[in-house]
């Protein structure tokens, strides 16, 4: 069964690597719908985007298809980003996961990004009428769970409008991971692979924000190593990431100290060639059927940062 699933994932990965030119090496600023690649979940933001091989929260679903493989019971929830200075007015994502049986998981997600009135300027810099901008995306997917080899596939429809210009996207995500044992896991994903309608901003074609990410996560059972009756664990992740319009790869590192599923303290650091590096942080709490998450991702260039809030309910 795993070979039958691995083959299409492998073919999709090869196709993604083979998508050269305008689709993969677009150059700086060559992609549209970049909101589909920004961090959306508190946990991912706190880990600076690391941890693709070991998702824990279903809220990671819209950026990491492998999040569906971590589902053990039905869950619904939402996440919101509170932007710092010079950010959007609102970003909300809603997610849902449902185990169909002992093997498969159905997942769905919806997200909306909205800006308030934006001051218009003409080619000479003079003020014109205000305009609005917004974007949304809906997705559905299927994956497996409870297996050493995990996989997930997602389909997404996206829409973006800026003033009187609009763009449609029909995209797909795929991911596969392998847990060697309870201490080490490897994973890789292809996200936003597909087609977007032409939108001629400034006379330049813009492609989908296709991205590749691969990583490894190691778990250190602190309690066992110290021969303590403790359930504290340390999870360390290292990932490599590249979006189609990036000239260089990003290196992402994240750490999570957790006590069972009750509490998790998180921090991350990313080496981003095109932007400033910074340390992110966050916390996660599980209380019965309720899941609460918070993450903070700084934006040094603007002297502020984004706050990520998430609430989920398992049933």
List PLM regions with ranges.
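Positively charged n-region of N-terminal signal peptides that target proteins for export
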Residues: 1-5
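Intrinsically disordered and other compositionally biased segments
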Residues: 7-9, 95
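A periodicity- and composition-biased signal for non-globular, repetitive helical segments
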Residues: 9-10, 40
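Subset of outer-membrane beta-barrel
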Residues: 19-315
């Amino acid at each position: 069964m795993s070979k039958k699933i691995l083959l299409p994932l492998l073919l999709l990965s090869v196709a993604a690597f083979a998508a050269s030119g305008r689709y993969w090496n677009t150059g700086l600023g060559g992609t549209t719908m970049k909101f589909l690649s920004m961090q959306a979940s508190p946990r991912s933001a706190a880990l600076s985007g690391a941890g693709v091989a070991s998702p824990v929260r279903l809220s990671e679903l819209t950026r990491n298809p492998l999040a569906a493989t971590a589902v053990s019971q039905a869950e619904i929830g939402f996440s919101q980003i509170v932007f710092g200075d010079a950010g959007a007015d609102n970003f909300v994502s809603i997610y849902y996961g449902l185990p169909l049986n002992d093997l498969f998981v159905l997942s769905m997600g919806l997200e909306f990004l909205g800006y308030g009135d934006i001051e218009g300027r003409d080619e000479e810099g003079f003020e014109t009428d205000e305009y609005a901008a917004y974007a949304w995306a809906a997705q559905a997917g299927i994956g497996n769970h409870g297996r050493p080899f995990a996989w997930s596939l997602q389909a997404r429809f996206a829409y973006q409008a800026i003033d009187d210009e609009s763009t449609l996207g029909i995209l797909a995500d795929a991911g596969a991971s392998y847990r060697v044992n309870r201490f080490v896991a490897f994973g890789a994903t292809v996200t936003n692979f597909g087609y977007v309608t032409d939108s001629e901003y400034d006379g330049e074609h813009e492609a989908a924000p296709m991205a590749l990410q691969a990583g490894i996560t190691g778990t250190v059972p602190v309690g066992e190593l110290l021969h303590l009756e403790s359930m504290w664990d340390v999870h360390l992740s290292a990932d490599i990431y590249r979006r189609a319009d990036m000239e260089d790869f990003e290196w992402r590192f994240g750490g999570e100290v957790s006590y069972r599923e009750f509490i998790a303290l998180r921090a991350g650091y990313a080496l981003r060639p095109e932007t400033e590096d910074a340390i992110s942080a966050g916390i996660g709490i599980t209380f019965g059927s309720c899941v609460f998450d918070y993450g903070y991702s700084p934006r040094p260039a603007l002297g502020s940062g984004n706050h990520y809030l998430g609430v989920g309910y398992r049933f």
